[in-house]
């Protein structure tokens, strides 16, 4: 859901449009557009990266917005939303603490983003041209995710001892410079065995924390960052 530049009314109407089977303006608009039966929608992210590109917000401000926006995202006709708050970027433990304290069980899940990346300014390095030092640095950065998870989980445990709020690491993976000759900003990168080892080691860590982690999503499935599939026109 667009919390950064959208309104509460807009998000509420999108939820109604997708999930209501009733006789209402938004459900009728969906029918007019060719879809009679409502969709089943489970996961609803209320904002994304609200600390950065999703609004450059303070955690206290976002927590108040989450409470407001999520209140109007209603359950229609047997569809129950699993509402997810926009969580921290890697080492921002204050963000998690503020949201757990101020939002608490108004959210079903809290997201977290962690990338194996050299930094956010300048070159991130080649996806395919690297030396032994680059390789071992990448493995070390990848394995740091365990310490990050432990610290976020400890904060969540302080406010939610029964672990009813899920942690969802919904963006993770390697991030390199775009492949030469591709469109800048489209984040098209090749994979090597280095990336495969990052995926394997990261998944191994995730399996240790399944009491709290209920979803993880590599970024992304096709043609962007550590993707499973690369396509070009009709070729895969």
Task: Describe each PLM feature range.
Residues 40, 105-106, 162-163, 209-212:
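Short, well-ordered loop/turn elements at secondary-structure boundaries
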Residues 17-20, 75, 112, 154, ...:
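Short, well-ordered loop/turn and helix-capping segments at boundaries between secondary-structure elements
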Residues 43, 119, 139-143, 201, ...:
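Solvent-exposed, flexible loop/coil residues
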Residues 10, 14, 69, 111, ...:
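Extended, hydrophobic alpha-helical segments in both membrane/secreted and soluble proteins
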Residues 64, 68-71, 75, 79, ...:
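Glycoside hydrolase catalytic-domain groove-lining segments
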Residues 114, 164-236:
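Aromatic/acidic polysaccharide-binding cleft in carbohydrate-active enzymes
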Residues 1-133, 150:
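N-terminal catalytic cores of secreted or lumenal carbohydrate-active enzymes
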């Amino acid at each position: 859901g667009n919390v950064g530049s959208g309104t509460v009314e807009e998000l509420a109407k999108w939820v109604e449009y997708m999930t209501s089977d009733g006789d209402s303006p938004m459900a009728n608009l969906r029918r007019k557009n060719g879809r009679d039966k409502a969709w089943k929608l489970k996961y609803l992210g209320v904002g994304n990266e609200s600390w950065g590109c999703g609004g450059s917000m303070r955690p206290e401000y976002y927590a108040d917005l989450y409470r407001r926006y999520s209140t109007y995202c209603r359950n229609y006709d047997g569809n129950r939303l699993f509402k997810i708050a926009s969580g921290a970027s890697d080492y921002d433990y204050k963000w998690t603490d503020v949201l757990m304290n101020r939002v608490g069980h108004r959210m079903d899940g809290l997201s977290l983003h962690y990338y194996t990346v050299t930094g956010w300014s300048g070159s991130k390095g080649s996806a395919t041209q690297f030396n032994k030092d680059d390789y071992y640095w990448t493995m070390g950065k990848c394995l740091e995710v365990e310490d990050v998870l432990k610290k976020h989980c400890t904060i969540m445990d302080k406010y939610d001892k029964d672990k009813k709020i899920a942690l969802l690491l919904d963006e993770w993976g390697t991030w390199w410079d775009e492949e030469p000759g591709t469109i800048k900003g489209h984040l098209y990168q090749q994979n090597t065995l280095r990336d495969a080892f990052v995926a394997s080691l990261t998944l191994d860590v995730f399996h240790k924390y399944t009491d709290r982690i209920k979803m993880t999503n590599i970024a992304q499935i096709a043609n962007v960052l550590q993707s499973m599939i690369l396509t070009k026109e009709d070729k895969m």
